[in-house]
UniProtKB/Swiss-Prot annotation:
TM stretches of this protein: 7-27, 60-80, 132-152, 175-195, 279-299, 310-330, 409-429, 449-469, 513-533, 556-576
Protein name: Potassium-transporting ATPase potassium-binding subunit
Functional note: Part of the high-affinity ATP-driven potassium transport (or Kdp) system, which catalyzes the hydrolysis of ATP coupled with the electrogenic transport of potassium into the cytoplasm. This subunit binds the periplasmic potassium ions and delivers the ions to the membrane domain of KdpB through an intramembrane tunnel.
Native organism taxonomy: Bacteria, Pseudomonadati, Pseudomonadota, Betaproteobacteria, Rhodocyclales
Organism: Dechloromonas aromatica (strain RCB)
InterPro entries: KdpA
Keyword set, alphabetical order: Cell inner membrane, Cell membrane, Ion transport, Membrane, Potassium, Potassium transport, Transmembrane, Transmembrane helix, Transport
Length: 592
């Protein structure tokens, strides 16, 4: 790993950790109703919507409210896509989005996945981008945060039947946290060169003729392949280029802050209109981890022991550093097949990367975005080396708990913390407890569901795709890498990440439906058990710390938590990883 990469990683961690306490304290004050201006701002909204802020909910009612909120979001996004040809702010006169793609996109943005099988600047009108996709970026982020706040209250309260009001929590986190930070962030991005306008697209003449290979398409619009499975292409030339316009900065801000990741442009944060400078790139990386890291302090603040939050944050940080080092290390190594063709190995694996970012910024961005269930990219993960590309896969397959998405990462890590203290209790023959609450059969059943639902969706979905002709038809690269593309797609969808090995042609009815199902159950198949755990914990009595109680704020617990995440979270995927990136790595270096 280069000196630049080490310095970049060090500066990133220092700046991130400096923000944890102030932002975490602010979020705790907002969500616990201690923000002074909240009442004046919120009261008109509550009256307009008929919400009684003093009426709290049990876990089942809270879960139903969250599900209803998100179902309505799916329906709204689907309708806007299907009607966009008849709606204003469509200067390119884009037609309605196809039913299967609209279904996939609606679920994708409602679940904070932001998987995009379509080309954003060639599919979505400005109204759809703003009113459907950007709005859901706020709402899906708010959903994740309020769920983890509910779980934290479950630990903090005792002998209680309720832990908050879902509508109040959603309002507070959106109005007082997500919205103000996004406004400031969008202004900063505009200053860096991110575009923000409603102009029609611009056709310009390039300085020289551009030659490229254009894939031949069949009657269904899918690439034709030869008998070896390779895409058939034909040479083409052009001297014109269409420059996409649009309100990018306002969407870019919440896309990163809310760990959403869906780009206005198809190239996402590799596009200069979304991420033009190294400074904007650094701030985008920082903003992805900003709220997930701060929520760890919020957790400690609300339960009354900030050491608990720092312990969870320490476990996350240690795993993050190891994974970031691995990604940057393997991307710094040149592809041996390209080296044989005369490419200078000193530059590392620059395929699919922007020269303004290079190896360090691209490798670190890839690690951050896949750990945090963001999915935004500033480089093409499909072009990473086999082991460099293995890191984003592992990041997601850990369950998106190393920082993770806003809210989702922390509640996922707390689920693993419950599992860790349960394992420790079994080893010493004592009833496990965490933060003064006994961990009993009901909690462990819900923990098991929350941990196992995602691997089930990933592995079953991948198996179905490689067995059926419709699934194999989307593979652009046969062999181990083609399998990795499918595995990555279902891993990304079920873990609500949204990034992709872009070689897979996923905008087909088969993948739109299959990935849509994986996204929905990968999100709410975890949220409902987590809320059930919160309700059960809130109803329990708090027990005093005894001589046999495992301290959950020291190095021993941090080590146990990391081990639990690695063993329980990752082992499910080892056979699948062996069939994909591991085989590809061995084949690549065997050829060398």
């Amino acid at each position: 790993m280069s000196n630049h990469a080490w310095i970049l990683l060090g500066i990133f961690l220092v700046v991130l950790l400096l923000t944890v306490k102030p932002l975490g304290t602010y979020i705790a004050n907002v969500m616990e109703g201690r923000f002074r201006l909240a009442g004046k701002i919120e009261s008109p909204i509550y009256r307009l919507c008929g919400i009684r802020p003093d009426e709290e909910m049990g876990w089942l009612k809270y879960a139903c409210a969250i599900l209803l909120f998100n179902v309505l979001g799916v329906l709204a996004v689907y309708a806007l896509q299907r009607l966009q040809a008849e709606l204003p702010l469509n200067p390119q006169v884009f037609p309605a989005v196809s039913p299967d793609s609209a279904f996939n996109t609606a679920i994708s943005f409602a679940t904070n996945t932001n998987w995009q099988g379509y080309v954003g600047e060639a599919t979505m009108s400005y109204l759809t981008q703003m009113l459907a996709l950007a709005v859901q970026n706020f709402f899906s982020a708010a959903t994740g945060i309020v769920v983890v706040i509910a779980l934290i209250r479950g630990f903090a309260r005792h002998t209680a039947k309720t832990f908050g009001n879902a509508w109040v929590d959603l309002t507070r986190i959106t109005l007082h946290v997500l919205l103000p930070i996004s406004i400031i962030y969008a202004v900063f991005l505009t200053g860096q060169g991110v575009i923000q306008n409603f102009n029609a697209y611009k056709d310009v003449t390039t300085l020289e003729v551009t030659s490229f290979d254009n894939p031949k398409l069949d009657d269904a619009g899918q690439p034709l392949k030869d008998d070896k499975g390779a895409v058939v292409t034909e040479p083409a030339q052009t001297q014109t280029q269409t420059l996409a316009m649009g309100p990018v900065a306002s969407q870019e801000a919440i896309k990163m802050l809310g760990t959403n990741g869906g780009g206005f442009m198809n190239a996402n944060s590799a596009h200069p209109y979304e991420n033009p400078t190294p400074l904007s790139n650094f701030i985008q990386m920082l903003s992805i981890f900003l709220i997930p890291a701060a929520l760890c302090f919020t957790f400690g603040r609300i339960v009354g022991d900030t050491r608990q939050g720092w312990a969870v944050l320490a476990a996350m940080t240690l795993m993050f550093v190891a994974l970031a080092y691995t990604a940057m290390h393997f991307e710094q190594q040149a592809n041996p097949l390209l080296t044989q063709l005369g490419v200078d190995p000193a530059s590392g694996n620059m395929e699919g990367k922007e020269t303004r970012f290079g190896i360090g910024d691209s490798g670190l961005f890839a690690t951050i975005t896949t750990l945090a269930s963001c999915g935004a990219v500033n480089a093409m993960h499909d072009s990473f080396t086999p082991l460099g590309g293995l890191v984003p896969l592992i990041d997601m397959q850990l369950g998106e708990v190393v920082f993770g998405g806003v809210g989702t990462g922390l509640y996922g890590m707390l689920v693993f913390a419950i599992m860790a203290v349960f394992i420790a209790g079994l080893m010493i023959g004592r009833t496990p407890e965490y933060l003064g609450k006994k961990i009993e059969a009901f909690e462990m059943k819900m923990v098991s569901i929350a941990i196992l639902v995602t691997p089930l969706l990933v592995l079953v979905g991948t198996a179905i795709a490689v067995m059926l002709a419709d699934g194999k038809a989307g593979i652009a690269n046969p062999g181990a890498h083609g399998f990795s593309e499918i595995l990555y797609a279902f891993t990304s969808a079920a873990n609500n990440n949204g990034s992709a090995f872009a070689g897979l042609s996923a905008n087909t009815p088969f993948y739109n439906v299959m990935l849509g199902i994986a996204m929905w159950f990968g999100r709410f198949g975890v949220i409902v058990p987590v809320l059930a755990i919160a309700g059960s914990l809130a109803a329990k009595k708090r027990i005093a710390v005894g001589a046999g109680t495992l301290p959950t704020h020291g190095p021993l617990f941090v080590t146990l938590l990391i081990g639990t995440v690695l063993l329980v979270g990752l082992l499910n995927y080892v056979p699948a990883l062996a069939l994909g990136p591991v085989i590809e790595h061995l084949v690549l270096w065997a050829a060398h």
